[in-house]
Structure formats: C-alpha cells, structure tokens
Amino acid sequence: MKLLPLLIALAAATPAVANSLVSPGVRPGIARSKLAATPVGEWNRLSRVGGNNVEVWTIDGDLLNKISFYGGIGRGRTLLRQVDRKRQPLPQVSATMLLTDIPALLETTYRAQGAVVQMSIDTQQPATLGTRKAIRFTYSFTRSTDEVQRKGEAIGTMVDGALYLVTYEAPSLYFFDRDIAKYRALLNSLAL
C-alpha cells in the first residue's frame, strides 16, 4: 500500500518532463531567446536540454537527426551545461568573438566534453541569419560512445555580444541526406 502513492506521484510527474510536439506554424521564443521559426512539418522538442538557452528538436530521436538551437548565449557562458569545471572546462562565449570563431567554439566544446574522438570543420562561408551577418559551416565527427560517423551543418551569429547558433546533426549514412532539406527549410524561416 505504501508503494501505491509513490507510483501515482511518479506517474503524475512524468508529463512535466515529457517531450512535446512542435506543430507547423510560427514558433517564437526558441531556446528562451529572440529566435523564432516557422516549421513546415512536425518536430519533437526534447525535454532534456544541455543548458538554459538550448532547445533540441528531432524527428526520429536525437541520435538519428537533431537540430539544436543555442539562443542568446551571453559573455562568459558556455554552449552547454558544464559537467566537470575542473577537469573538463568548456570554452566560454566572448562578447568580442568574430563570426569565424563560432565553428572553433563548437568544436572545442565537443572535444572538451570528451564526447567526440574525431571532429573536423569541413567548410565555412558567409551567410545571413534573419537580417544579421552570420557564418554557415559544415563539420563531421565521431562520438566516442557509438563510433558512428556523423555530419553537421550549422549557422551562427553574434547579436549584442550574445551567440545565436543553430546546428543540424545526423549519421552520415542515410539520415543526414534524408533530412537536410527539412533543416534548411526551417533555417530559411528563422528570424531574430
């Protein structure tokens, strides 16, 4: 009998941390920031996030395809929540970062976490995010946990000393090419 109230409490708490559906249409305030997008199709918003200003969307699960929104990461803050500040400190955003520093910040963050065994920035080119000058870049990496080769495409900009970054990542085989058009359509709808 003592177990029944505990099970009821756990069942009631589950929806509070559940993933949620992102329906087509205007979606303001992504990653608790000025970012807004208009998805054409449905996405799933994952409840677990890597930080206060991070939001992750996926279609099939974050290991198969995911878009991460980093919204307004300010000076002195990291892209992701730090797990071990002493042994694995993450790089911090600087208000004076150049656009060309953004790919290196992402790579250094992934490497500092020990989450990747190999990573390379493959291309970099000027772009726009909304009306802002930005950098678009592609990268590839292999996670230490599953050794699956993944590809990524990202766009980032600095606004008033804060970083706005959107990344798309998926396994190189099949999923990256299958869903890249959905990411790019979402990217074209982004506003700051």
Language model: regions and residue ranges:
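N-terminal targeting sequences that direct proteins away from the cytosol to non-cytosolic compartments
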Residues: K2-R87, L105-E107, R111-Q118, P126-R132, ...
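Long, charged/polar, surface-exposed segments that mediate recognition or autoinhibition
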Residues: T100-P103
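Beta-strand secondary-structure signal
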Residues: R136-T138
